[in-house]
């Protein structure tokens, strides 16, 4: 990976007490916290060699980022994802940025290498989530567009790029599109995440996946 590029990777992280509420019937609060920490470890592994800053209001997250992940940290001042990213833009000196959520543990170093190569020819690179969100956003300059996360942000960011006549590229990756919000999402980790901290952690909890031979889904996520 070309580490000579002056670029910052921004990872916004929600407070622990509001983490992954749709998993609350499947994982305890402590387990959801540890799931997040393992997902962050997988993401940091993919970003090896790049400068990373984690933005959060949660002191435990910031301590983990600083001491375990060796990342820079920014204490979030205002509520809301867009405000957190705007604050990071104001506090970092770097011009080029990549924004990545904290719940895409299947991202690989190869994806980041691809993004860095593409960045030579494009102003904006975007990878969609399965639900129409934005799971990776590269900006050649952090002031290129108005950040519009939440809702169908993929379409909003594309509209921003078109409105400003930017050179943009849609990086369509299934592995990046998988963000973890529901028990069903955990099944993708078992199928595609063999080398991840996240899968190893889920296995330690007695979680497993079985194929589902019906039109109602591909698999069933179970806990022993």
Swiss-Prot record:
Pfam families named among the record's database cross-references: CofC
E.C. number(s) listed in UniProt: 2.7.7.68
Temperature-activity profile: Retains all activity when heated up to 90 degrees Celsius for 10 minutes and retained 38% activity after 10 minutes at 100 degrees Celsius.
Catalytic activity: (2S)-2-phospholactate + GTP + H(+) = (2S)-lactyl-2-diphospho-5'-guanosine + diphosphate
SUPFAM superfamilies assigned to the protein according to its UniProt record, in alphabetical order: Nucleotide-diphospho-sugar transferases
GO BP: any one term: F420-0 metabolic process
GO molecular function, one term: phospholactate guanylyltransferase activity
Annotated pathway: Cofactor biosynthesis; coenzyme F420 biosynthesis
Family of the protein in this entry: Belongs to the CofC family.
Quaternary context: Homodimer.
Name the UniProt record assigns to this protein: 2-phospho-L-lactate guanylyltransferase
Gene source species: Methanocaldococcus jannaschii (strain ATCC 43067 / DSM 2661 / JAL-1 / JCM 10045 / NBRC 100440) (Methanococcus jannaschii)
Encoding gene, per UniProt annotation: cofC
